[in-house]
Amino acid sequence: HIAKFIMYATTVMNIIGITCLMFGFKFEWYWIKFTVYENRFTGCYVNPNLLGFISVVSIFCCHILSKGHFMRRIAEKIPEPGISKIWIVACLATNAFSLILCDSNASLVLALGYAIVYIVYMFFADKAGLSPSKIILKITALFLVGVFLTGSALMFRTICQEGFSVVVSKTTSVVDLLLGKTESELVQEGLTPEQREQLENDKITFSHENKNIDSGRKKLWLESINLFKLSPIIGISNGNIVLYSAEYSNGALEYSYHKSDLHNGFLTILVSTGVIGFVLFGIFGFRFAKHSAQHLFLQKKTYRDDVYPCLFAFLFAYLIFACFEKALLYDISFMVVWFWLIMGYMSCYITKFEPTLESQYLFHGKRLRRVTRTML
């Protein structure tokens, strides 16, 4: 039901946002700029990065809802009408288009990571007849596929942004004519250089105004090194990041939109909780990742037509995404809630469908043997 709601809601919101964009409808409510913010498409959301993340989540939900075995199992428990393929196609198209126009690099990394990890599973799902030579061949093929997908995605995004920029300029010109603007206001002949420069600045190109590919993250990450040195063992606490930055680093992080996060989930944990907290979080994450990967790749059956590979691929891709965004722990947002929700679904899936008792202990083999001896 959550996946269906996300699919329907995001499709409708994207259609509304793209329609408003084409006809030049923009407005500002308090500090929030809708449809376009800093030359990037926001649609009905508060910022482009949130739009990009929700677009990837919607594509992920569409992928889940297209799994036949999963949908048949759900239908057996909750009889209800099926999902029209028109909705799935519309959701995929509008969200992919919104992901391109919002120009969110981190969200594009999330989408590519999800696709590549899922392809890795598809390559190695069938373990019959695997040999060292075949494994090397598949790894080489996967590397080439990853390079091709990354290059194609970047090129396709640039082409779509430039093409739709022209479309938007044409449609807004038509709207201006219909609203009664004079020809002299629409044609650039006779305009001063300052007016022409203003027109160029107002033109929507759907690309970052800040041309640095890191979008200022490098400055945050370098600054975090100084904060980490203040208390490397137990950390400085998440709530002190901005305060300590103002006191010890000339206020380099004293910006309202940075809050107390370093745009890197792992780095934020390291600075906030020190080496001790980071190691504890790493142990928890490693044990869960090991268990989920073993459940996926070392089972006799495959999950080609089930949702477990989708959950695994999204969670793995999110860990890469967390290197560039406010994620994992301290930022209470839709992104963080969705990450822990997917992890919870994976845990329930493993506990329910793995036949061994050991799954409940996350490979505590020694503990399992002690429990068995005690019972005997």
Outline where the language-model segments fall.
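Alpha-helical transmembrane segments of multi-pass inner-membrane proteins
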Residues: 3-31, 44-128, 291, 316
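Hydrophobic transmembrane alpha-helices and their immediate junctions
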Residues: 124-125, 248-251, 273-316
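Membrane-interfacial, low-structure loops and terminal tails that flank and connect transmembrane helices
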Residues: 71-84, 295-305, 357-376
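Long extracytoplasmic/lumenal interhelical loops at the membrane interface
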Residues: 37, 206-273
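A membrane-periplasm/extracellular boundary helix in multi-pass inner-membrane enzymes
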Residues: 21, 122-208, 222-230, 238
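Active-site-proximal inter-transmembrane loops
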Residues: 30-46, 259-261
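Transmembrane alpha-helices of multi-pass inner-membrane enzymes
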Residues: 60, 111, 115-119, 284, ...
